[in-house]
Amino acid sequence: MSVTVKMSGTRSRGTFDELERYWDSLPAEEDSAATLTELPEKNYTTYQWPLPLGDTAVLALKTDFDRVSRFVRIDRRTGEERRVCYTGQVSTRPSLNGGRVWWTEYRRSKLFEQRVNSQLCYMDLSDGVPRSVAGRRRALFPVETPDELGWVEYNPDGRYTVVVRRGSEPERRLSTPDRAEVHGLAWDDLTVAWYVLITDDSGMWIGRIDSEGVHPITEGAYITLSNLRAADGKLYYGSIASGKDEAHCYDLMARREYRITTSAYGSFSPAPADGRVLLTTYDRRGYRVTEQAADSALVPVTPSRLPVNLVNPPRKRWDVVNLDTVRFEAADSRMQRDSFRTKRYRKVPNLVNVHSWMPLAFNPFAAVDEHVIDLNLGFTLLSQNLLSNTEAYASYGWNRNEGSLVNLGVRYFGLGVRFDLDASYGGNQLFYSLGQYNQQTGKYEYQSRPAPDKYYSVGLSATLPLYFQQGYHTRQLSVSTGWNYSNGMVANMREIEWGQGGLISNIQHIGFSRGLHKLSFGVGFSDQVRMSHRDIAPRWGYTLSTNYTFNPANSHFSDLISFYGQAYLPGFVRHNSVKVAATYQTSLGGYKYPSGYSPLSYRSTRLIPRGFTSADILSNNYTAVSLDYQLPVWCPEGGIGSVVYIKRIRLNAGGDYAQFRDAGHDVWRRIWSVGGDLVVDFNAFRQPASATSTFKLSCYKPSKGSMWFAASVGLPF
């Protein structure tokens, strides 16, 4: 905003108001194409890339706030539509031939989140099942002809190649010019040739491609062209030559270009359909499917290097350098090297890059992953390297109960396997001591403890996350292992002496050994469908995991085995969500009392009834279930200027139940809680729509104790 005020003398709101007044002064134009699909209010809808299905139907890709992208079949006579199948995130326009649809989807690699490819996909209309073509993960703009299948293949070095496959014959690979990008591919049945849409230093242009190279048909111009298709000796595409998006065609026989539509706000994605043209036309509710006769509005187009300046109001010139007039030559590069020495970027020394700090001590990893924000007086340093494969934080905090606290966390993603390092110092040393109930005195007796030292711990874990994106579904297999050491004081079980009545006779003199090792292994699998803009959670999905934890340095410590399962189901009304979860954990081996109870054991904190902590349970045949029903109650879609935007307020009603065997193995203990959560989805300080944070207020009534209240913040990182 400050740049706008400085250069034009007005604020951005005034600029937008002036722009709106200018647009209102322009002559109004009507849409030349007739509407096939009406758009609903308050559900922004986008139809893309319509294709003819005979004389009575249209196939199009549809997305709206309520549902993710899917192919729909539209009746051209009534406008009624039927879903064919859901898709992943489509990367380039689909094409149709002989009952088979071809398109490409973005798919991330199995190991690296930053590596995203474009997967070749197809679907037979007879069964409506999307399929992927193995080994074709860098494909764009697929086109099938009666005899061949062609697509554009890109390489990481910036080179594009047109690949043509005919049956079992060797593939033909047609090269494109160096330093050029391919933005479209089409095949014309009349001229029996392939055509490409090229972008290079001269602008955008259309050419015919064969084994000898690319032969220009139009001249390069700084005019955006898009969605190239061909049929009956004509090329169809979108162009902004007239000053806004309209459908154009190029007659290959007459060598003339025509604009074939007029529209109020723009027409897109023209597709020939037996003498007619299918399009999408824009208005405030989205993009709707329209059609018109192919020759109903043939407006000749005069070749030009620039589009008509239609929608841009007159502006005064800013006193800045026009980059189009700047020339950077080899001599300039040599002079720059003399002034600024080129240095190699060394990865290891640059893993740490402290970029900001905060005047409070907290764990940002726990805040993002678990929505747990534990604040203390102090400060936090945040680090992220330039390659974004290493994140770290260091904090110093203080509170009255624990004194000084120092924490360190590092995450590294650069090798596919994720490594986590954490270290802590400060607070009170943990004791794993013994206790027993003396029936004669009616009191509990506990092991004597020495004065505690400062607590410290260090841990290292490795996780291999494998992603398997299959369009509408995303599956993940995760294998992990971790080690942790702390200076916890563990009861010395070798010194136990048993007396009469099954009581420990020397409980005050058993003593402790210093140090607690924890080694864990885990595996998990999840499968979830894509979420729409208004979905609270995936409509369908599940997660299964199991973990095994043991102490390799102390055989008296019991091993812990745990299982966890979670499922997402649709609610009774659209965008309502049901979440069901269950877990089981128990201790194995280790030292056991004569009654069979294991006094030294680990506990999993997963799925403990809300209002309780891990201190309230025992890992002795522990079983728990949880049920949550979540629904939106209000969508304000407003807020305070550029400070906060409240997107949605939702309500969750939940209940938890757990049971486990008490110390004697013959008594079942049962705990439960019921309550709800009020969740506010908001965007702070002009964050993009995808970066939505949450604020949650929780209130639950546990079966033991008073009401339990909690508040948490979820960050979108």
Predicted regions and their residues:
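A flexible loop/linker signature enriched in serine peptidases of the S9 family
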Residues: 1, 5-18, 44-45, 62-71, ...
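Outer-membrane beta-barrel initiation region
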Residues: 5-56, 60-63, 239, 296-416, ...
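Short coil/turn segments that connect the beta-strands within blades of beta-propeller domains
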Residues: 55-56, 99, 146-147, 190-192, ...
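Short loop/turn segments that connect beta-strands within beta-propeller blades
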Residues: 75-79, 124-128, 165-169, 209-213, ...
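Transmembrane beta-strand segments that form the barrel wall of outer-membrane beta-barrel proteins
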Residues: 135-136, 260-263, 349-373, 377-400, ...
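Transmembrane beta-strands of outer-membrane beta-barrel pores
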Residues: 364-366, 385, 396-400, 412-416, ...
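C-terminal outer-membrane beta-barrel translocator/porin domains of Gram-negative envelope proteins
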Residues: 423, 428, 434-436, 447-449, ...
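Outer-membrane beta-barrel "beta-signal"
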Residues: 521, 625, 676-680, 706-717
